[in-house]
């Protein structure tokens, strides 16, 4: 079986993965994910119709966001679970369709007669994987013949995946926004239109930027209202000789529950990858057994998890194929999945997840090896940065800071990403890097020093904390009484890998930022015509 996937930066030859995903995704998993997205579009068709009659179902809307999140790179490689999501998607679609038709018939005293797209009515006969795979071949990426329409439809879906991920994270912390969910469904439903134009699709793609900002703001509010505003924090990168759990991914609530359940058990907990910023939240750093951060970005995990020696928990995306050396001590939870890896089930209403299997494994393994480390400085989210804004402004006015470089985004395996390390090393000592996301691991261990106590690497947090970088830029614009954000002494050198980074890019464009340098390559899902339009309109370049 073949596949066609070009949603990430590492897609084969910067064209598409067709035999096997560079990420490790099988053709079967890729095709099942295509079908899941197809059914999500069908749900969205009915949800939009229902919303026109003031009929809503939050469980359906949230499922659409969750379903998109499942298809993000490195989230779920478990075919069986993708099949379960498709089963549930068909059920959710039926629920919202019936709700709509019931109200429609009462209001108009007649049955709904409009022509309905196949995604909204396709019903499997056998509900098995073979049937799903056969259907997936019909509805995958290449089912759209027009190159530019295909490019824009996929650009749209890829951007929506990031919005969906941030929205889902916020919902886990009891924060939701109906307008964001409604936009996701409206945009998905629009991709089913046979008469949609290039201009209409381009406008929808750019609209993602607005909702990307809204979703990041929602998640920021969820995180900070739950765990407090991040504080400037020194994080240790070594390990201690005790039983240990390493927590990777993005889900702060999972980390909190692990910390709660390991209190008094002699276990030290470490963050990994995108979980590093958790060490700066008051509600998490208060736990004395949160010992620091081990390792770097996601793509080094196979060696790092093997070396770590303790139990490992993957809370969101960024999982790679586990090596046999640690497969019996790695656990997934939430939307993450890998075949034959033990999964921690979701929490029941108002309860916690039960991380007992992880804790037992850590205790069974016993103490891990002691390693010396160094301290790195984190915690410069927008609230903390605002508290030192006067100092930053004064340093700019005095000429001690001459330029800021926003170097947020994702890290990855591509050797060309060494460019970002060299770029950081070669910056003048009067330059300051503003970063968020795992791209930071290319330079956050360098000894770049500080300027009057201001670190030359200002780390705002996870990829969603790019929102903090935007707020910081807007505050600087206000402080210098400028009319345009592009008048600031800021350059944008963004590294992308997966779909959330595309959402961040569109959010920056929405905020009016121009002249972004995007790398290490430009997205394969952009056709030549679409790429030319976007590059010319927003002055986007590559490295």
Curated annotation (Swiss-Prot):
Cofactor(s) this protein requires = [4Fe-4S] cluster; hybrid [4Fe-2O-2S] cluster
Q: In terms of domain of life, where is this protein from? A: Bacteria
Tell me where the signal peptide lies.
none
Q: According to the UniProt entry, which residues carry Cysteine persulfide?
A: 410
**EC number(s)?**
1.7.99.1
Which Pfam families is this protein grouped with? Prismane
Binding sites annotated in the UniProt record for [4Fe-4S] cluster: 5, 8, 17, 23
Task: Tell me the compartments it is located in.
Answer: Cytoplasm
Keywords from the UniProt entry: 4Fe-4S, Cytoplasm, Iron, Iron-sulfur, Metal-binding, Oxidoreductase
List the NCBIfam families hit by this protein, alphabetically. Answer: hybrid_clust, PRK05290.1
Q: Which family does it belong to?
A: Belongs to the HCP family.
What this protein is called in its record is Hydroxylamine reductase
What organism is listed for this UniProt entry? Petrotoga mobilis (strain DSM 10674 / SJ95)
């Amino acid at each position: 079986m073949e596949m066609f996937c070009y949603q990430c930066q590492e897609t084969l030859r910067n064209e598409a993965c067709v035999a096997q995903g560079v990420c490790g995704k099988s053709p079967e998993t890729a095709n099942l994910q295509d079908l899941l997205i197809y059914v999500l579009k069908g749900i969205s068709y009915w949800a939009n119709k229902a919303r026109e009659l003031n009929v809503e179902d939050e469980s359906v809307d949230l499922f659409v966001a969750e379903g998109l999140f499942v298809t993000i790179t490195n989230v779920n490689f478990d075919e069986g679970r993708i099949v379960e999501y498709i089963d549930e998607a068909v059920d959710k679609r039926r629920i919202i369709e019936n709700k709509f038709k019931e109200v429609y018939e009462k209001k108009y005293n007649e049955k709904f007669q409009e022509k309905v797209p196949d995604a909204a009515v396709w019903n499997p006969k056998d509900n098995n994987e073979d049937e799903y795979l056969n259907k997936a071949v019909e509805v995958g990426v290449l089912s759209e013949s027009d190159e530019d329409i295909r490019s824009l439809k996929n650009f749209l879906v890829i951007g929506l995946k990031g919005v969906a991920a941030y929205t889902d994270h916020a919902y886990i912390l009891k924060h939701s926004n109906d307008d964001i969910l409604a936009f996701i469904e409206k945009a998905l439903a629009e991709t089913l239109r046979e008469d949609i134009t290039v201009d209409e699709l381009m406008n929808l793609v750019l609209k993602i930027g607005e909702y990307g900002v809204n979703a990041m703001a929602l998640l920021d509010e969820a995180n900070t209202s739950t765990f407090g505003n991040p504080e400037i924090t020194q994080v240790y990168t070594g390990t201690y000789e005790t039983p240990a759990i390493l927590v990777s991914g993005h889900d702060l609530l999972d980390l909190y529950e692990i910390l709660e359940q390991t209190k008094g058990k002699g276990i030290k907990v470490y963050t990994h990858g995108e979980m590093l910023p958790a060490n700066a939240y008051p509600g998490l750093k208060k736990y004395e057994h949160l010992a620091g951060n081990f390792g770097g970005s996601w793509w080094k995990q196979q060696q790092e998890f093997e070396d770590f020696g303790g139990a490992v928990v993957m809370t969101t995306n960024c999982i790679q194929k586990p090596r046999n050396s640690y497969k019996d001590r790695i656990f997934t939870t939430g939307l993450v999945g890998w075949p034959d890896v033990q999964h921690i089930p979701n929490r029941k209403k108002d309860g916690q997840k039960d991380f007992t299997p992880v804790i037992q494994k850590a205790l069974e393994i016993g103490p891990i090896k002691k390693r010396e480390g160094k301290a790195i400085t984190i915690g410069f989210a927008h609230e903390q940065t605002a508290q030192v804004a006067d100092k930053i402004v004064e340093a700019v006015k005095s000429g001690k800071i001459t330029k800021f470089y926003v170097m947020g985004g994702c890290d990855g395996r591509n050797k060309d990403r060494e460019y970002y390390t060299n770029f950081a090393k070669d910056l003048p000592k009067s330059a300051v890097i503003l970063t968020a996301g795992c791209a930071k691991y290319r330079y956050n261990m360098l000894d770049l020093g500080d300027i009057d106590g201001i670190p030359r690497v200002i780390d705002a947090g996870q990829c969603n904390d790019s929102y903090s970088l935007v707020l910081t830029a807007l505050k600087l614009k206000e402080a210098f009484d400028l009319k345009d954000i592009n008048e600031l002494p800021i350059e944008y050198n963004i590294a992308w890998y997966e779909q959330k980074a595309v959402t961040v890019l569109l959010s920056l464009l929405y905020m009016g930022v121009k002249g972004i340098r995007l790398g290490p390559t430009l997205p394969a899902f952009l056709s030549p015509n679409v790429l030319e339009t976007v590059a010319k309109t927003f002055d986007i370049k590559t490295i």
